[in-house]
Amino acid sequence: MKKRLDIAMVERGLAASRTQAQALVMEGKVRVAGQTEYKPSRQIDDAASVEVEAPPRFVSRGGEKLEGAFDRWGPALSAEGKTCLDVGSSTGGFTDCLLQHGAARVMAVDVGTNQLAYSLRVDPRLWVRENFNARFMKPSDLPETPSLAVTDVSFISLKLILPPIRDVLADGGEIVALIKPQFEVGKGNAPGGLVRDERLRIEARDGIVRFAEEELGLALLGLAESPIKGREMGNVEYLSYWRK
């Protein structure tokens, strides 16, 4: 019997989710019968050997992006013992990173459903709310008040997500937000989803910084290019670190 490679990887415990499996395959880290395979949809036999070069640290590559923030701004930036909020949790890369950094509680919210890796979903430190539009999030929507919030969202501007995050965050709380220029410059400036013009990328980044400072009263603690580019098109993205 044959089945898709990404499905087989999850069933064999080689990946925590199909999203993670697909990323590993497309990055050339998976071998089938000794040969590197680049198509997650490839049909393989049940008896076919599948090897992953190096087990990933997080359930998705998003975790490596947030890890870049901890590497750059820690120990001032810390999740240890904190109640945290992950807006746009998706597969759970940021959530996984927070838990591995000692978060006492992570509240994961996402507009989608059934995306979060099972290994995270069963963690007792996790509270999950799916089918939830964070644009309209209020303090009463959460079981606790977070002191650290992180966000990696797509197909929406941070100008619509940062205000509700600020409103639910504890006074003095911190935010790590991934600025994705491809969703800030307008479709006409990102043909095929890729922002090729560095000037537009910088303008998008700086526009979010001005908005957060001037409209939301947030204090910028750090700004740096993400160590990992956007998955689909290789877009340059930016990590931003804030205090309320």
Predicted regions and their residues:
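Conserved S-adenosyl-L-methionine
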Residues: 99-105
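Conserved class I S-adenosyl-L-methionine
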Residues: 79-90
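S-adenosyl-L-methionine
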Residues: 107-156, 160
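Conserved beta-strand signature within the Rossmann-like core of class I S-adenosyl-L-methionine
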Residues: 172-185
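Core SAM-dependent methyltransferase catalytic element
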Residues: 228-244
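A short glycine-rich, Lys/Arg-flanked "PGG" loop and its adjoining helix->strand segment in the class I
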Residues: 159-174
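A basic, amphipathic helix-loop patch mediating RNA/tRNA/ribosome contacts
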Residues: 1-48
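Residues at the N-terminus of the alpha-helix immediately C-terminal to the conserved SAM/SAH-binding loop
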Residues: 90-95, 112
